[in-house]
């Protein structure tokens, strides 16, 4: 990345910034169905959990965290273990700057190195920015849950998409790394 931007693995020291980026999405939008913003301590736990089994990356601009992306479990059944659910969040005003793409590219590289094959992403509709980003990154629509979540006095649909992280043409490794 250029212009004073850097993508790196997240750590507990990024929890305050990640919590601050996420809070407006929780309180002011239906983009996430969480109803209470996580505390920095809760965010630190999420970062640690993702780092253990998947990945969590942050985008720094001029030494300050302005976005993050992470992978987590898709479903708990063993057959799904090579698939993961991914999300990306950027500080307000940072959309359409290439940060989301850069975060996902770095995330997919780390997930591929751990043996993951497929990424799944859900997005509350309408959300043109997220739909456009995921489409541009090769995510394909696989279905929409209609009126699945109630937030801010309205029902919301969630579109689900998926894309390969690595080719799924062979048998998966015995274990994830």
Segments from the language model and where they lie:
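Conserved acetyl-CoA-binding loop-helix of GNAT-fold acetyltransferases
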Residues: 96-110, 132-136
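Glycine-rich phosphate/pyrophosphate-binding loop shared by adenosine-nucleotide-utilizing enzymes
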Residues: 5, 64-68, 156
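Helix-loop element at the rim of GNAT/NAT acetyltransferase active sites that forms part
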Residues: 20-37
